[in-house]
């Protein structure tokens, strides 16, 4: 049995690694005991282990290797394996970040044991129940002993669901991550040379969500719209393609126009540098919406809803769906946008604020305030 001050962190995907990196560094700086549990939800090397190495983070203490499968099978396997790991660790707190199946598994297991559950990036809502992540967010928020909301808007979402007494608005750890890594990315990234790019003279596409890439017509529409947009502004497109999307391109026999360049998934520093200097991002990723806003890079989101409405409110992001004409119009407008919006995601001290609460309340009682 380990020290009852131990904090366990359960994660499983690239965005979780990036957003929890500031928390891990803050734990190291405080010399506070912690254990890292990686479910293996992301199973490609470039989407997983390379991030720990490049960001100088310690390797996970537990690597569960769950991999990809249906939502139910994957989550069920995670619950079983995470329970074994957490029973061995016997932590005082378990921290999860975001809205993945790894987060839900960590939340369910922790809710059944003598440990506190903290949800980082709590309160996000798209109000679209067709998104698997929306269910994960809601269930995890309602199971948590403390909720670390990134914005006042997220806290207001929780209040409408009756959660008010255990919420702290900390800002988003993605701001901490961008602040900590931007200079390093500038000094180490070679993407401009590798791809023969000039700053602010290219577009970046990221499309990986099931509702977009698993539907041939939607995927084809996105590709067509982005290609036409690139022609209209005279810029090439870099598309770091997710394994899921690459499989669908082959399965659907979709051709990629010459002005869209497919590249392998990039490491975090390369992608951050590419994102920081893009003329516009076109994405279906929630994390890219946030990072683009922080980096002052205009964003066009090929979705009908977003759990990051702050990006739209401040003028950093436009939701357009997948209609090619709307994508073209939005990209043309975005390229001309003055990035003079205010970052709505905090001041870069989220990790410190989170651990001030968690490390200051490490003694566990036998009750959970909300269960």
What is each of the regions a protein language model found here?
Residues 239:
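Conserved proline-anchored active-site loop of SAM-dependent methyltransferases
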Residues 1-235, 245-371:
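Nucleotide-activated sugar donor-binding and catalytic core shared by glycosyltransferases
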């Amino acid at each position: 049995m380990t020290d009852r001050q131990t904090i366990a962190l359960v994660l499983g995907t690239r965005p979780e690694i990036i957003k929890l990196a500031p928390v891990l560094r803050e734990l190291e700086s405080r010399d506070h005991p912690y254990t890292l549990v990686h479910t293996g939800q992301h199973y490609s090397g470039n989407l997983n282990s390379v991030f720990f190495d490049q960001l100088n983070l310690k390797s996970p203490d537990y690597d569960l290797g769950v991999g990809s499968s249906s939502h139910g099978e994957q989550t069920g396997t995670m619950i079983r394996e995470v329970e074994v790991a957490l029973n061995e660790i016997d932590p005082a707190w378990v921290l999860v970040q975001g809205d993945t199946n790894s987060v839900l598994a960590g939340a369910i297991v922790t809710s059944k044991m003598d440990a506190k559950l903290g949800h980082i990036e709590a309160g996000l809502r798209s109000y679209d129940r067709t998104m698997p992540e929306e269910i994960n967010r809601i269930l995890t928020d309602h199971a948590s002993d403390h909720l670390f909301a990134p914005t006042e808007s997220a806290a207001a979402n929780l209040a409408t669901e009756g959660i008010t007494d255990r919420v702290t608005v900390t800002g988003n750890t993605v701001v901490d991550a961008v602040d900590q890594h931007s200079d390093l990315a500038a000094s180490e990234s070679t993407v401009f040379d590798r791809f023969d790019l000039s700053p602010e003279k290219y577009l970046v596409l990221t499309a990986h969500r099931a509702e977009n890439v698993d539907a041939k017509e939607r995927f084809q529409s996105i590709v067509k719209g982005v290609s036409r947009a690139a022609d209209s502004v005279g810029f090439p497109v870099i598309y770091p393609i997710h394994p899921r999307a690459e499989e669908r391109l082959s399965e659907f026999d979709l051709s990629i126009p010459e002005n869209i360049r497919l590249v392998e998934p990039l490491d975090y520093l390369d992608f951050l540098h590419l994102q920081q200097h893009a003329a516009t991002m076109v994405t279906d990723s929630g994390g890219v919406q946030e990072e683009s806003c922080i980096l002052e890079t205009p964003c066009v989101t090929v979705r009908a809803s977003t759990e990051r409405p702050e990006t739209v409110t401040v003028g950093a992001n436009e939701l357009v769906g997948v209609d090619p004409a709307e994508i073209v119009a939005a990209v043309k407008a975005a390229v001309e946008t003055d990035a003079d919006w205010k970052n709505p995601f905090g001041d870069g001290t989220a990790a410190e604020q989170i651990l001030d609460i968690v490390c200051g309340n490490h003694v566990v009682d036998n009750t959970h305030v909300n269960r």
